Amino acid sequence: MHCSCLAEGIPANPGNWISGLAFPDWAYKAESSPGSRQIQLWHFILELLQKEEFRHVIAWQQGEYGEFVIKDPDEVARLWGRRKCKPQMNYDKLSRALRYYYNKRILHKTKGKRFTYKFNFSKLIVVNYPLWEVRAPPSPHLLLGAPALCRPALVPVGVQSELLHSMLFAHQAMVEQLTGQQTPRGPPETSGDKKGSSSSVYRLGSAPGPCRLGLCCHLGSVQGELPGVASFTPPLPPPLPSNWTCLSGPFLPPLPSEQQLPGAFKPDILLPGPRSLPGAWHFPGLPLLAGLGQGAGERLWLLSLRPEGLEVKPAPMMEAKGGLDPREVFCPETRRLKTGEESLTSPNLENLKAVWPLDPP
């Protein structure tokens, strides 16, 4: 049966909120338009709080975020009954409906104050899984790379801490798997003479597969449960210190040009420059972090697994080897490492050797 009740309240408009109070844009749903019966009580209360003409009926408490007082309980119950087409509505029934929200932690009654309630907006974000229209600051331990190919999705704040721990464990598991594959292998052999033949070298970042270290990949199962989350462009990483030198090209022997896939990119290795302290360079014990970027500026950032970091030690000559071991030559003065019969770009590679701490902490 069609309801002839008159609409109370006005459409949601975040710009019309009371000055000094900042509420989320998701406070109103699409169906909470004037005259709609499919509206929850707490949505209706927000509509009354927004409209100036109901200040004598219900109003925000001064100096308290999310706290409001019902000045005329009977009038609020009458307005709610008109909205829901229930003429027999009274404050007793309305208060029972409000107590339902206590268990849901959507709002609670303020102790010591009559007809005074307070919204728990942080809990509402988790209950309704809305789109939080803000740019969340990236974690410095997770978003150290360039903007990801698959952009991370926004997550309710109630599950961010759990997802953060799970992502850290996933990063460490990925590191252990990669180091386990590289440790038993000797110097890799390239097959540049044979076109079309695949190389047996594990090249980090050379495969065009899905992003396995990005936030969106670790949240795949969660995204399937959340309705329609939006994405945002993560901020650019902070500028690097002046004592860091960028080594262009992969640290493993590159595949022949005919075998390069269209989606592959050439990672860069970031190592401390010659202006840093001699001996061992110390890094905080961070897991392996990688950022997959777009265009020619894509980079793969490798950080040490242990607090000792990278150690540079003198070593005998090694140009006799046809390939380069991933645990070997890293020099800040080198711009590209070449394999096979090509000569090395810097003669200083003959007396330097980089030792990776491959065993997990």
From Swiss-Prot:
<dbReference type="InterPro" id="IPR046328">
    <property type="entry name" value="ETS_fam"/>
</dbReference>
<dbReference type="GO" id="GO:0005634">
    <property type="term" value="C:nucleus"/>
</dbReference>
<comment type="similarity">
    <text>Belongs to the ETS family.</text>
</comment>
<keyword id="KW-0805">Transcription regulation</keyword>
<dbReference type="GO" id="GO:0006357">
    <property type="term" value="P:regulation of transcription by RNA polymerase II"/>
</dbReference>
<comment type="function">
    <text>Transcriptional regulator.</text>
</comment>
<keyword id="KW-0804">Transcription</keyword>
<dbReference type="GO" id="GO:0000981">
    <property type="term" value="F:DNA-binding transcription factor activity, RNA polymerase II-specific"/>
</dbReference>
<keyword id="KW-0238">DNA-binding</keyword>
<dbReference type="InterPro" id="IPR036390">
    <property type="entry name" value="WH_DNA-bd_sf"/>
</dbReference>
<dbReference type="InterPro" id="IPR036388">
    <property type="entry name" value="WH-like_DNA-bd_sf"/>
</dbReference>
<feature type="region of interest" description="Disordered">
    <location>
        <begin position="178"/>
        <end position="201"/>
    </location>
</feature>
<dbReference type="InterPro" id="IPR000418">
    <property type="entry name" value="Ets_dom"/>
</dbReference>
<dbReference type="Pfam" id="PF00178">
    <property type="entry name" value="Ets"/>
</dbReference>
<feature type="DNA-binding region" description="ETS">
    <location>
        <begin position="39"/>
        <end position="120"/>
    </location>
</feature>
<keyword id="KW-0539">Nucleus</keyword>
<dbReference type="GO" id="GO:0030154">
    <property type="term" value="P:cell differentiation"/>
</dbReference>
<protein>
    <recommendedName>
        <fullName>ETS translocation variant 3-like protein</fullName>
    </recommendedName>
</protein>
<dbReference type="GO" id="GO:0043565">
    <property type="term" value="F:sequence-specific DNA binding"/>
</dbReference>
